[in-house]
Amino acid sequence: MKPKRTILCVDDNEQSLSIRKVMLETRGYRVLAYSDAQQALQRFAEGGVDLVLTDLIMPGFDGSKLIEGIKDISPETPAILLSGKVKIYERETGADVFLAKGMYAPVELLERIRLLLVRKRGPKRAHHRVHAQGPPHHIASA
């Protein structure tokens, strides 16, 4: 059985967090849900997270600070930032994907997650059978 990929999901809105958690779990992902970005960063530092999905606007420690902290620890970890604010300057956050809340279908979010996880894993490698056999050996007779 293929191991589940782990997504760290962060949003101060408990209802939004719960909806995303259920949506992702029904698609086979393991979800670590946090409503506090600082606690989420502490959990991320423990390891085992494959992707981060976070809201931008949160009290105190916002999503862009969370992503900055995550990229400091693990630059290759993909991050998706969700926000109701769509100003251009807010797109410069270090996130791999920026989605405006209410402007995407859940299927688009799921596809972005899938693609980022594939990209993180890298291209599939061709598995070549390696033969331990070298050139034929000649045995000299005495």
Task: Map each language-model feature to its residues.
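Receiver (REC) domain active-site loop signature in two-component systems and cognate sites
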Residues: 58
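Acidic catalytic/metal-coordinating carboxylates
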Residues: 35-36, 62-65
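Short amphipathic alpha-helix used as the core "switch/output" element in two-component signaling
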Residues: 42, 64-76
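Non-catalytic signal-transmission and effector/linker regions of two-component phosphorelay proteins
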Residues: 1-6, 107-142
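Active-site residues of response regulator receiver
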Residues: 55
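Conserved acidic segment of CheY-like receiver
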Residues: 4-15, 20-24, 52
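Short hydrophobic/Thr-rich beta-strand motif most characteristic of the beta2 strand and flanking loop
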Residues: 28-35, 43
